[in-house]
C-alpha cells in the first residue's frame, strides 16, 4: 500500500491508523509563523462510524487502507444478516448489523448500495442517496391546520419515521434523502 504524508491528506482518502481503517473527511494544513507546520484532520473510523479529530506533524505519514468500495444489490435480510450480490460476478456477501448500522431503515429489495470491504468483509453499507417509500402510518392532516409546526411524523414501509408535510396521507409514496432522513417530495 502507498504511504501518505500529512500534507497529502485529502477528503475521501482512506488511511490506516492504529491498525484500523479511517476515512479522511476534511484536512487543513497549517503553517504557523513560528514552529513546525502541521495538519488538522477530521477522520471517520470505518469500523464504527465515529468521528475523530487529530493533529499530524508535517513529517508524519500513514499507510493507505486496503479498503474497497463496491456497488452491490441488496437482496434480503434473514434476521441476522443482510445479503448483497455483485451484479457482475453474481457473488453474494453477507453483512452483519454492525456493518449495516442505521442504513437498515433505508434498504429496499434490489436497491443499489455501496458496500465498503476491508479484508474481504463488509464494514459499512451506504444506501442510495434517495429512496421511494410508502407511508404506512401518519396522522390525518386537517385542511387549514397550519398553526402547528408545519409537519407531522410518518412511519414508512421499512419502519423509518420521517417528518412530512400535513397534506401527505397514508398509502402515498414519498421520496426521502437517506443522508439526512428528510422528506424530499411526493412521488407521482
Swiss-Prot record:
* Residues found modified as N6-(3,6-diaminohexanoyl)-5-hydroxylysine: 34
Describe which pathway this protein belongs to, using the record's wording: Protein biosynthesis; polypeptide chain elongation
- Domain of life the protein comes from: Bacteria
Q: Which GO molecular-function terms appear in the entry? A: translation elongation factor activity
Record-annotated membrane-spanning stretches:
none
Q: Name a single GO biological process.
A: peptide biosynthetic process
What is any Pfam family matched here?
Elong-fact-P_C
User: Carries keyword Transmembrane?
Assistant: no
Q: Which family does it belong to?
A: Belongs to the elongation factor P family.
> What is the protein named?
Elongation factor P
Recorded source organism is Citrobacter koseri (strain ATCC BAA-895 / CDC 4225-83 / SGSC4696)
Q: What is the lineage of its organism?
A: Bacteria, Pseudomonadati, Pseudomonadota, Gammaproteobacteria, Enterobacterales
State the gene name recorded for this protein: efp
